[in-house]
């Protein structure tokens, strides 16, 4: 681990888990069965579960880690190995920009989810957005052998995808406060969002 990665591990990672869990927890339906796609170490899902003990959260990832905090199954990165309408909600936290085709997984989430998709990802709009996001991704993920295709979209592109796939955007959270000041001025800005996508009945 290089010095920058050590700083990230010590000062950013725990805060990110706390902040995102607090932002995400209120967004799920009551007593929902949730699929966390790309769940990684499971710390965010675990923290959401502490805030929302009514939820039943299952993890899914292409790389199942030995330190995963929630029950996690392996998948091929393309097809979600569940029947239609298995889950009330599907969660993606900083996952889709690691895929070559985010449409594929959003379509699969629409299939296996009954009510909503909760998506945390990046908005590549803004001053030096792309190099900033690439650098953040390298620091946070490279040492875990996570794929880094840097497939970042602008909000207008996300909105077009959601419409194309039949989702309704029920809400969008921005300025999430993941980073402390002064890092927030560089790495937060409007680069992050959480979208609540409703799956039509």
Segments from the language model and where they lie:
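Class I SAM-dependent methyltransferase SAM/SAH-binding core
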Residues: 41-79
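Core SAM-dependent methyltransferase catalytic element
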Residues: 180-201
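Class I SAM-dependent methyltransferase Rossmann-like catalytic core
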Residues: 1-20
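A conserved beta-strand element that flanks and buttresses the S-adenosyl-L-methionine
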Residues: 91
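C-terminal alpha-helical "lid/dimerization" subdomain adjacent to the S-adenosyl-L-methionine
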Residues: 46, 122-182
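A short glycine-rich, Lys/Arg-flanked "PGG" loop and its adjoining helix->strand segment in the class I
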Residues: 103-117
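Conserved class I S-adenosyl-L-methionine
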Residues: 31-40
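Short catalytic micro-motifs in class I SAM-dependent methyltransferases
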Residues: 94-95
């Amino acid at each position: 681990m290089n010095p920058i990665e050590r700083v990230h591990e010590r000062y950013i990672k725990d805060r990110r888990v706390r902040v995102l869990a607090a932002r995400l927890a209120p967004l799920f339906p009551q007593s929902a069965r949730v699929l966390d796609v790309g769940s990684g170490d499971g710390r965010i899902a675990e923290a959401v579960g502490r805030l929302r003990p009514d939820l039943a959260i299952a993890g899914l990832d292409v790389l199942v880690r030995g330190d995963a905090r929630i029950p996690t199954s392996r998948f091929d990165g393309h097809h979600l190995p569940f029947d239609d309408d298995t889950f009330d909600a599907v969660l993606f936290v900083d996952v889709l920009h690691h895929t070559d085709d985010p449409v594929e997984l959003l379509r699969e989430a629409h299939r296996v989810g009954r009510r909503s998709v909760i998506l945390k990802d990046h908005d590549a709009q803004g001053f030096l957005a792309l190099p900033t996001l690439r650098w953040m991704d390298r620091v946070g993920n490279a040492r875990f052998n996570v794929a880094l295709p840097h497939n970042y979209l602008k909000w207008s592109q996300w909105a077009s995808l959601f419409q194309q796939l039949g989702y309704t955007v029920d809400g969008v959270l921005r300025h999430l406060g993941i980073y402390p000041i002064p890092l927030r001025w560089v790495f937060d800005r409007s680069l992050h969002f959480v979208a609540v996508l409703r799956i039509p009945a």
